[in-house]
Structure formats: structure tokens, C-alpha cells
């Protein structure tokens, strides 16, 4: 007869085999990249590798701290997101090589942040000591707002880094048409439009002029910020819709189950009233 501990390990392996395999493969990959960066003397990238290994532990920490179980699909998405952002994006320079790499990650970020916001509220919503009850629609709306708030705060961070350290986290965009009230000849509140812009000339304090050869006007981050927020919106909206139908189906939606964390000890006790008092119910 197998030892109980061995049986427990076998059960965990059967249930979480896919997550375990992805976790092991990604960690091995990060360690190999870190060794290569140490050999090349690039210690900034070594730090990113160490940070990635620490972030890989985040799903397990969340499960223990919040007493929840993350679905395999959601946990794999989180691990791949971390790897794609830090290793492939930063060290592999995918942000530069693939123009839409950052856009895809911001979309995933919106999805994952909505998942976090939704799960926290859903856990509280089903807790035996909860003093209010949110309807599925309100849960979805709050999860959506949580994700968008995180997205806005991140853009604040990018702007701060650009202003203080000139990191260009808010990527530039070359445009050929602009409109601005600062160009109005009368100084009024009427926007003046410049079309067919083909280059930007920088005039320095000593009178030196340098044509940048950009093929247009350099927009310093505005369009990138709006694009990031828009795709964050798409990711957040997608998860909020999934979460809404999950709650409406009382957790029976098989597709939604792949993305919704499950609270281990949040069910109401049997002697608790089946209906939440109307004064505490938000519909």
C-alpha cells in the first residue's frame, strides 16, 4: 500500500500536471538565460531574471495567503505573462522587435487584473461574515473598474519614469497630422491643423539645426498611452463578461471555471440564512 503522503503527491500531480510542467520549463529557461547574462557581465538582466523567478512564486503565495485555488489555465496565463514581459520583452527585446508585443501584454494585464479584482470580491461576497452581497452585474462592473484603475496607475508610473529618468516607457509614435491651439495665429482657443508633416527639425540653443529624418512629427507617448488603456479596457471587459456568466450560472460554467479562482473556505454555514437581507443586498 502506498504511503499517504505519496498518494497525496500523486493526486496533486494528476490535477496540476500541466501547471507543474510549464512552471518547471519556464524556471529552467530563466536560469539558463541568467547564466548567459552573468557570463556576458550584464547584471541588469541578471536582476530581471532573479525578479522573474520571484514573480513565478506569486500564484502560490496568493493561493496560501487568500486560501484560494487558482485554475490551471489562469495560473499558466499568469506564468506566461511574467515570462513574456520580463524575459522575452525586456531581455529578448521583443518590445522593439515586435511592435504589438506591448499591446498584447497590456491586453492580458487588463484580463488578469480583472480576474484578481473579481476573485477578491467573489471571495468576500461568499464569505460567511460578509455584510453585503453584490449581484453578478455589480461584481463584473467592480472587477472591470479595478482593472482599469490598475491600468491608469501603471500609466502614471510610466509617465513618472519618463519625466524623471527619460526611460521612454511611453513609446513615441510618428504622425503626419497634428492639431493644436498653441499654433493658432491669433492665440485663441481654435485648433490649427498641420497636415502632411514629413520631418522634425530640432533647433538647439546655439542655433544648430538637426533634421531627425523621422518621416513625420514625433508624438511623445500620448497615442501609446491611449492604446495601452484601450487594450486594457478590452481585456478587462472580456474577463468581466466571463465572470458575470460564471456567477449567474452559480459556478457551473465550464469555460469560465478555467479563469475564476475558487475560495476554499468561503461558503456560508448551513445555519446561515439562504437569502441575504435586502438592506445589505446590492443588485
Predicted feature locations:
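Short, Lys/Arg-rich, polar N-terminal cytosolic tail immediately upstream
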Residues: 1-16
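Membrane-interface helix-boundary motifs at transmembrane edges
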Residues: 13, 61-73, 129-134
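Membrane-interface helix caps and helix-loop-helix hairpins in membrane proteins
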Residues: 38-43, 65-68, 91-101
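Structural signature of hydrophobic alpha-helical transmembrane segments
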Residues: 39-53
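Cytoplasmic-side transmembrane-helix entry/capping segments in multi-pass membrane proteins
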Residues: 50, 69-80, 103-106
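Alpha-helical transmembrane segments of multi-pass membrane proteins
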Residues: 56-60, 81-86, 143, 147-154, ...
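Interfacial helix-loop-helix junctions of multi-pass membrane proteins
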Residues: 91-102, 148, 152, 156-239, ...
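Short, highly charged, low-complexity non-transmembrane loops/tails of multi-pass membrane proteins
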Residues: 253-279
Amino acid at each position: 500500500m502506498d504511503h499517504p503522503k505519496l498518494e497525496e503527491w500523486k493526486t496533486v500531480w494528476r490535477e496540476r500536471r500541466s501547471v507543474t510542467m510549464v512552471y518547471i520549463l519556464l524556471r529552467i529557461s530563466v536560469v539558463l538565460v541568467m547564466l548567459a547574462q552573468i557570463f556576458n557581465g550584464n547584471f541588469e538582466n541578471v536582476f530581471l531574471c532573479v525578479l522573474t523567478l520571484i514573480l513565478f512564486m506569486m500564484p502560490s503565495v496568493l493561493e496560501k495567503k487568500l486560501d484560494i485555488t487558482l485554475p490551471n489555465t489562469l495560473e499558466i496565463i499568469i506564468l506566461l505573462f511574467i515570462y513574456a514581459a520580463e524575459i522575452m520583452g525586456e531581455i529578448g527585446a521583443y518590445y522593439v522587435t515586435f511592435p504589438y508585443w506591448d499591446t498584447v501584454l497590456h491586453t492580458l494585464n487588463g484580463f488578469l487584473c480583472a480576474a484578481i479584482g473579481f476573485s477578491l470580491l467573489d471571495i468576500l461576497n461568499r464569505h460567511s461574515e460578509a455584510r453585503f452581497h453584490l449581484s453578478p452585474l455589480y461584481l463584473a462592473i467592480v472587477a472591470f473598474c479595478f482593472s482599469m484603475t490598475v491600468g491608469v496607475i501603471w500609466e502614471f508610473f510610466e509617465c513618472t519614469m519618463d519625466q524623471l529618468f527619460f526611460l521612454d516607457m511611453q513609446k513615441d509614435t510618428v504622425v503626419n497630422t497634428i492639431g493644436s491651439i498653441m499654433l493658432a495665429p491669433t492665440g485663441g482657443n481654435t485648433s490649427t491643423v498641420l497636415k502632411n508633416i514629413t520631418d522634425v527639425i530640432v533647433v538647439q540653443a546655439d542655433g544648430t539645426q538637426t533634421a531627425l529624418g523621422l518621416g513625420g512629427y514625433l508624438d511623445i507617448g500620448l497615442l501609446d498611452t491611449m492604446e495601452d488603456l484601450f487594450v486594457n479596457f478590452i481585456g478587462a471587459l472580456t474577463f468581466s463578461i466571463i465572470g458575470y456568466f460564471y456567477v449567474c450560472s452559480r459556478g457551473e460554467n465550464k469555460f469560465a471555471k478555467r479563469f475564476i479562482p475558487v475560495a476554499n473556505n468561503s461558503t456560508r454555514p448551513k445555519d446561515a440564512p439562504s437569502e441575504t437581507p435586502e438592506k445589505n443586498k446590492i443588485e
